[in-house]
């Protein structure tokens, strides 16, 4: 995100600031939801499911990686729509990887996608581009 200010000047700085603020909000929301739901991870609850990498925390719901990737992508695409092929592919791979690695249930990833989309949309509604750039 820091590169945006160098590449796109003031506009890039504003985009990076909005992405950072949205990301921080996503992190806080993710932590609250994890503590509230306390859903065990698939590799702990389902025999035969193997965690291929160690988890960053104890609980499964929602997928923090997916929530961050989706909220970032929603905001980034509003600023830089030409990056859609790259960002949408990246975000889809993040979501799929969480299930493939045995760290999340598909519902964790789906819920994180919905929450991240809503959070990104809320960020764009509260801080619309035409107001920020004007």
Regions found by a protein language model. Name each.
Residues 35-47:
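Membrane-helix interface/capping segments
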Residues 47-134:
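Membrane-embedded catalytic cores of phosphoryl/pyrophosphoryl-handling enzymes
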Residues 1-36, 50, 105-134:
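Terminal transmembrane helix and immediately flanking juxtamembrane interfaces
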